[in-house]
Amino acid sequence: MLDPVEASSVPVVDDSTIRSLSDFPDRNVFRREDRYPALNIPVRRTAELRKTLKHVLWRRPKTKNVYDDETDPQRRILVLANIDEDAFRDETVQRLIQHEDCRKASYTVTTAYENYTVEEILKQLLPNESEIPSAFEMVGHLAHVNLRSSQLPFKYWIGKVMLDKNQPRIRTVVNKLGTIETEYRTFGMEVIAGYQGENWSVVTVKEERCTFRLDFTKVYWNSRLAGEHRRLVQQILKESQTKPLVVADLMAGVGPFAVPLTASHGRRNQVTVYANDLNPESYKYLLQNVQSNKCTNIHCYNQCGRAMVHQLQAENIEVDHVIMNLPASAPEFLDAFRGYEGVKRPCIHVHCFAPKASEATDYQDALDRCSSALGCTLDRISNDVHVHVVRDVSPNKNMLSVSFLLPVETQSLVKMKLQPLRTETSEPGAKRIKSN
């Protein structure tokens, strides 16, 4: 089992404190009327003046700032922002009032539940000391939040508001339970709003002109890694324009690297990918995504990443790039390259977590982990080492990408012996599928 990659434990809350949906306030509670400064303008000048006065116009989502003048069909009311300084002191507004056919006015605007943002509604619902959950991850039709202990009594209210404000884009809101500490990097979750019927957790995600189908409760997917997926895919595709390339994706998941590298997008494909994942569910969806995106030159496996490295060598498959996207423990898998028998020195791309200290310290910590697993020093110059921050994971942790050429010294090391792996699949040995 992998080490936990999150610091927090499962928040505990007394069930008796949890607010039910039946206790959610009536929407009329949020209804309010406010008087705003306004300009009474000719109908024919509406578009012109909205553009001229955009810096002082009143704005709110799903709410108009132009209304008909009920006393004169040839005129309209243009609502101005209720700012600290009188909106009528604005130079442009003064000029329009003094020299053109515009008049001072005021207008009562009704703001209802539908007009407020998620944050505005939750500020009215949650206690002052409770932090407002303002961010969430989208995975297909799912919204994924990670609520703190102080927010848990209001989890169903929070889910309802998020759902109300984001339909139909969001169909289900889930809250993460505990840490990511399973072998397959999945985590427990609970539905706090929306659809939870059959296949509620099976989603479709679009990325890099490809469509991915996956069960969010059974496989790992992080939408915040889209930029890193794009960066590495584009780097390899650009290199493949001048020569054919072979890529080994050792922890391929449902295919965020492997699928766009081999998908048919009207281009000549010069990339062959050997995609592997230990999770049988990831393997299942990888096969589906390979088929639905019409991928070519891809071989799919369901086995341990270390075994995959040894199998490629046993089959005399020369690899140009190796992708190891398992941040919690990918550097430790580099021990599989001891005694490497290939002629080429592949470029290896390892993703890992590192504590935040200083850039130099973080980078060196990642390099030390890689060197320790490889069994030799990873020299920055001779191994063409490149390190960069992929994303800010938490206040104390970054995710890094470490790319380097496999050191020649690994060839003289003793090849490690692999222990038989007990997986959740009942099928003996590795499963392999080829797509031409």
Curated annotation (Swiss-Prot):
S-adenosyl-L-methionine binds at residues 229, 277-278, 325. It is an enzyme of class 2 (transferase). It comes from the Eukaryota. Pfam families: TRM5-TYW2_MTfase, TYW2_N_2. Transmembrane segments: none annotated. Its EC number is 2.1.1.228. Signal peptide: none annotated. One of its GO terms (biological process) is tRNA N1-guanine methylation. Disulfide bonds: none annotated. It catalyses: guanosine(37) in tRNA + S-adenosyl-L-methionine = N(1)-methylguanosine(37) in tRNA + S-adenosyl-L-homocysteine + H(+). Gene3D superfamilies: Met-10+ protein-like domains, Vaccinia Virus protein VP39. Keywords: Cytoplasm, Methyltransferase, Mitochondrion, Nucleus, S-adenosyl-L-methionine, Transferase, tRNA processing. Its main location: mitochondrion. PANTHER family: TRNA (GUANINE(37)-N1)-METHYLTRANSFERASE, TRNA METHYLTRANSFERASE. Monomer. Specifically methylates the N1 position of guanosine-37 in various cytoplasmic and mitochondrial tRNAs. Methylation is not dependent on the nature of the nucleoside 5' of the target nucleoside. This is the first step in the biosynthesis of wybutosine (yW), a modified base adjacent to the anticodon of tRNAs and required for accurate decoding. Belongs to the class I-like SAM-binding methyltransferase superfamily. TRM5/TYW2 family. This is tRNA (guanine(37)-N(1))-methyltransferase 1. The lineage of its organism: Eukaryota, Sar, Stramenopiles, Ochrophyta, Bacillariophyta.
